[in-house]
């Protein structure tokens, strides 16, 4: 769990308004609670901050063009190559130094084959684009079972998406009335949708991957009518317990003859450390070992392959 120095509600608002840097936001929904209300929150928060981002909407399921989108692409009758070319034509070049941020909304990633999903996302990704894509958890990934010579050890589509995503938003329904989770699950398995689902008030779990390599996880109740976000009490208790478990000067006294404690300045510097994994696993390239040489490092001057400068 994240440290208590972060405000979870502010973090959620920054992600929804695209103020927080997160190139790929993955929304996981279901029949019980779709991502429609959450997408509306992205649009509302971005406008409330005074940011009128151009929105490119890629439709696999949506029939009518949403009023808020700038460009609408009907992807149902397009092949992979032409779809990527048309999307890129609406986005600024990745090498552009000054370009307005764009939002790309994909209403369903389930229609893209597992074989092409990583290539599709990597070709769209750029420093000037934030992708907000939905994946339906209720639909099983059947493509991987019919691809010839498919490696059984290769991960499924959902695992790939969760690995690539910089932010994961798992949406869940808030049940009202006499319905319980087990009853709703049984009805949905029989394709019987009870009343009281897809409410304006829903629950979501936020997983935000930081540049330092760790993840922040929070549970919220979202009211899409009032645009209010409430941190769940269970998450608050975990935050308090984790903060109680942090080191204090009193806990470390008498253990050694030297100081084991860290000052607030040192803790802040620790939180701002960025490990090289994000640079090594960026879009469009394979893994790499990233190391920055310093002048004091020892290296062999006669080795032609070891020239750090």
Swiss-Prot record:
Q: Name one GO molecular function term.
A: identical protein binding
What Pfam families is this protein classified in? Answer: Elong_Iki1
Q: InterPro entries attached here?
A: Elp5, P-loop_NTPase
Pathway assignment: tRNA modification; 5-methoxycarbonylmethyl-2-thiouridine-tRNA biosynthesis
Supply the Gene3D superfamilies for this chain: P-loop containing nucleotide triphosphate hydrolases
Keywords tagged on the record = Cytoplasm, Nucleus, Phosphoprotein, tRNA processing
Phosphoserine modifications at: 3-4
Mind listing the GO biological process terms from this record? regulation of translation; tRNA modification; tRNA wobble uridine modification
Main location (coarse class): cytoplasm
Subcellular location(s): the record lists: Cytoplasm; Nucleus
Additional free-text comment from the UniProt record: Present with 3870 molecules/cell in log phase SD medium.
Q: How does it assemble?
A: Component of the elongator complex, which consists of ELP1/IKI3, ELP2, ELP3, ELP4, ELP5/IKI1 and ELP6. The elongator complex is composed of two copies of the Elp123 subcomplex (composed of ELP1/IKI3, ELP2 and ELP3) and two copies of the Elp456 subcomplex (composed of ELP4, ELP5/IKI1 and ELP6). The Elp123 subcomplex forms a two-lobed scaffold, which binds the Elp456 subcomplex asymmetrically. In each lobe, ELP2 is tightly sandwiched between ELP1/IKI3 and ELP3. The Elp123 subcomplex binds tRNA through ELP1/IKI3 and ELP3 and can bind 2 tRNAs simultaneously.
**What role does it play?**
Component of the elongator complex which is required for multiple tRNA modifications, including mcm5U (5-methoxycarbonylmethyl uridine), mcm5s2U (5-methoxycarbonylmethyl-2-thiouridine), and ncm5U (5-carbamoylmethyl uridine). The elongator complex catalyzes formation of carboxymethyluridine in the wobble base at position 34 in tRNAs. It functions as a gamma-toxin target (TOT); disruption of the complex confers resistance to Kluyveromyces lactis toxin zymocin (pGKL1 killer toxin). May also be involved in sensitivity to Pichia inositovora toxin.
Q: What is this protein called?
A: Elongator complex protein 5
Q: Which organism is it from?
A: Saccharomyces cerevisiae (strain ATCC 204508 / S288c)
Query: Taxonomy-wise, where does this protein's organism fall, top ranks first?
Result: Eukaryota, Fungi, Dikarya, Ascomycota, Saccharomycotina
